[in-house]
């Protein structure tokens, strides 16, 4: 079957659900697709379709990021259902990095929980521009005052991490009831999507900058070659253009021979699109997650840089003890983690949880970075800091 062309007439935005485990992120994702399907251009998606990665079934927690698409009158959305559980924050870091806006799901019955805070912090660190709040499971709360209290708590938490807590739209509803077809709660889903349409700014596309796409996944298509998938971070790529594969190994060049999005073929892709790029003459093992595809000469691989770093406090789930020069955590850039050695500036003996610090980092493998590149610092499966590159050294 020939693939149909992708419709570009509507503006496009990438959004996702974030929040504490079991507060209803996946149910809400299914409810949005199901309710919008009744009103027009969207294909309904069941909860099981979204929650379908094999690992998830055993533990009842969402691990992989599910991508679905739906439309409102105003926009076409690509929606990522971000994993909620702390063990899978690694995926959250790569998932949240793909968001022009987020829907923060908070169970009205439980209020904000540790991962609610962690996801707001991560959203701030990976540069998610705006969040909208969905207070879920309100059918389980009889007390109007309790709802108001939870809403106030969420707003305060957002303000604490520099989101405009007083202005953020908060919609109260029940994803499960909406999914079951309860008209009163379906209306709340439409209200939520109206808020997303209105409040989440039209993504400022970096289409005019040189092309770059962080590689998230790689697979081979028999008879066609190797495909790298990811979200175009900036610029445009047209079929037939040259790109460099940068990071981890020596830089190499290839030509993009095909571009597709949501299984539809494109002539070109631009910043914000989630695509698969078919690469000419590249073996499956020549490209890997953590590398980037970029316009030749536009970005270079480096191992040593200066950075401004915020070290999470113990209460935020960070370290309980200070660290010193020669500390060796993992540095997460875009889609991958690389071990690096920390060098603290003269006069800084140690760094306490909750501190801001300027540090020099030397990575064990080169990564495509430049001033302004953001990263997270992780150790033993948890985020302990976040930072931004301030100066490239080598």
UniProtKB/Swiss-Prot annotation:
The record lists the membrane-crossing segments as: none
Transmembrane helix listed as a keyword: no
Q: Which UniProt keywords apply?
A: Cytoplasm, Elongation factor, GTP-binding, Hydrolase, Magnesium, Metal-binding, Nucleotide-binding, Protein biosynthesis
Principal subcellular localization:
cytoplasm
Where in this protein does the record put region G1? 19-26
Family annotation (PROSITE patterns): G_TR_1, G_TR_2
**InterPro entries reported in the protein's UniProt record:** EF-Tu_GTP-bd, EF-Tu_GTPase, EFTu-like_2, EFTU_2, G_TR_CS, P-loop_NTPase, Small_GTP-bd, T_Tr_GTP-bd_dom
Q: Where is this region: G5?
A: 174-176
Q: Where is this region: G2?
A: 60-64
Q: Where in the cell is it found?
A: Cytoplasm
Region (G3) residue spans = 81-84
Q: Which Pfam families match?
A: GTP_EFTU, GTP_EFTU_D2, GTP_EFTU_D3
- Residues binding GTP are 19-26, 81-85, 136-139
Q: Which annotated residues bind Mg(2+)? A: 26
Which range is the signal sequence, renumbered to this chain?
none
Q: Name one GO cellular component term.
A: cytosol
**Region (G4) location:** 136-139
Question: What GO MF terms are annotated?
Answer: GTP binding; GTPase activity; translation elongation factor activity
Keyword GTP-binding attributed: yes
The UniProt similarity line reads: Belongs to the TRAFAC class translation factor GTPase superfamily. Classic translation factor GTPase family. EF-Tu/EF-1A subfamily.
What does this protein do, in the record's words? GTP hydrolase that promotes the GTP-dependent binding of aminoacyl-tRNA to the A-site of ribosomes during protein biosynthesis.
Q: How does it assemble?
A: Monomer.
Q: What is this protein called?
A: Elongation factor Tu
What organism is the protein native to? Staphylococcus haemolyticus (strain JCSC1435)
């Amino acid at each position: 079957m020939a693939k149909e062309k992708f419709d570009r007439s509507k503006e496009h935005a990438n959004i996702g659900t974030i929040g504490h485990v079991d507060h209803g992120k996946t149910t809400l994702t299914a409810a949005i697709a199901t309710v919008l399907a009744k009103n027009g251009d969207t294909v309904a998606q069941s909860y099981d379709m979204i929650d379908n990665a094999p690992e998830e079934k055993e533990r009842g927690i969402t691990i992989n990021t599910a991508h679905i698409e739906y439309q409102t009158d105003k926009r076409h959305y690509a929606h990522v259902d971000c994993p909620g559980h702390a063990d899978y924050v690694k995926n959250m870091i790569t998932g949240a990095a793909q968001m022009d806006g987020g829907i923060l799901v908070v169970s009205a019955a439980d209020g904000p929980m540790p991962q609610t805070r962690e996801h707001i912090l991560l959203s701030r660190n990976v540069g998610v521009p705006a969040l909208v709040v969905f207070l879920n499971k309100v059918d389980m709360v009889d007390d109007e005052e309790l709802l108001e209290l939870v809403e106030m708590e969420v707003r305060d938490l957002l303000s604490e991490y520099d989101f405009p807590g007083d202005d953020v739209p908060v919609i109260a509803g029940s994803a499960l009831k909406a999914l079951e077809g309860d008209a009163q709660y379906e209306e709340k889903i439409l209200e939520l999507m109206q808020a997303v349409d209105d409040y989440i700014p039209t993504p400022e596309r970096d289409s005019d900058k040189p092309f770059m796409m962080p590689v998230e996944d790689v697979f081979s298509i028999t008879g066609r070659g190797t495909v790298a998938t990811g979200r175009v971070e900036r610029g445009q790529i047209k079929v037939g253009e040259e790109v460099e594969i940068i990071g981890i190994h020596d830089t190499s060049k290839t030509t993009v021979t095909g571009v597709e999005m949501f299984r539809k073929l494109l002539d070109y892709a631009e910043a914000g699109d989630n695509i698969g790029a078919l690469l000419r003459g590249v073996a499956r093992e020549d490209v890997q997650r953590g590398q980037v595809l970029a316009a030749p000469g536009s970005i270079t691989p480096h191992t040593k840089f200066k950075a401004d770093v915020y070290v999470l406090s113990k209460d935020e789930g960070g370290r309980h003890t200070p660290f010193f020069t020669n500390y060796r955590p993992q540095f997460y850039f875009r889609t991958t983690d690389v071990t690096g050695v920390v060098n603290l500036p003269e006069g800084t003996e140690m760094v306490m949880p909750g501190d801001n610090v300027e540090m020099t980092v030397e990575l064990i493998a080169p990564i495509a970075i430049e001033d302004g590149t953001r990263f997270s610092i992780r150790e033993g499966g948890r985020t302990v800091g976040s930072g931004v590159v301030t100066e490239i050294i080598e």
